[in-house]
Amino acid sequence: MSTQLDPTQLAIEFLRRDQSNLSPAQYLKRLKQLELEFADLLTLSSAELKEEIYFAWRLGVH
């Protein structure tokens, strides 16, 4: 089992916990969107990631 963070695995886990009722097409679209977002987040440095978290917190995004 790999401990390396993978954008696809993170997106699938996120969607698995999501309570939204999505059609198969909506699910795939959301999966691709989340993969891109997680891939971007994984490229950030620690300081950049902290800045993103703080910015999201200020906007009320949980």
Swiss-Prot record:
UniProt cross-references to InterPro entries, sorted A to Z: YdiH
Top-rank lineage group of the source organism: Bacteria
Record's protein name: Uncharacterized protein YdiH
Organism: Escherichia coli (strain K12)
Native organism taxonomy: Bacteria, Pseudomonadati, Pseudomonadota, Gammaproteobacteria, Enterobacterales
